[in-house]
Amino acid sequence: MNNSENNATPWLFEITPKNKFFSLNLTEVWQYRDLLLLFVKRDIVTVYKQTVLGPLWYLIQPLFTAITFTIIFNNLAGINTGTVPPFLFNLAGITVWNYFTACLMGTSNTFGANAGIFGKVYFPRIIVPISIVISNLLKFGIQFGIFIAFYVFYYFQGAAISLNGLVVFFPLLIIVMGILGLGLGMFISSLVTKYRDFSHLIGFGVQLLMYVSAVVYPMALVKEKMPEYAWLVQYNPLAYIIETTRYMLLNVGHISFWGL
């Protein structure tokens, strides 16, 4: 009887979330914009602090990756990129892919890496992952500048490359990539706080995801060579974004509004 009476006793206080799960108070984020800028500056300064080459690593990583992919996938495996130079083809995909992975990897450990700050002072928690996405725009801008430099070089070398008229919408693709990295990274971060195994799987999973995201090959090649596995790429929104990037910047491939 006593147990049933205790269970029936109503709570004096009930703590409930102020907003719904998917509700974002962007007005509050704007009110803390100065703090957001401080986090952005922190992310930029601390990445390569006390390193010899510093920001040059922004250039080294995509260049050597593009060279390696060109040797392995184009020269050895014989993947055809049409009239576009293989190095430029790979560099276009790698530049956009690097921005996504930087946002994903940076936000996937948000709650764990900033637990001390979260417990000391109140501010909108969404500010930290947003600052990571914004700071990675600087890295993307530098790498995209390298792509433009090689684009101009190949153009004056007589390569059959040209911009597509839809290139004006290219910034929207970058915004979409940032949002995807932010959303998926925050979801993984919430899992990592409870299941530590995810922290070991995220790097391996990103590597596997790259190979089904059409970073180093055209999507049409999968349908031609391995049609039974084409669904792995066709149902991957990242593959359509990267394919659309090459369509806009190199005028090669195709664009699928359904995939986007």
Spell out what each predicted region is.
Residues 1-260:
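Hydrophobic transmembrane alpha-helices and immediately adjacent juxtamembrane helices
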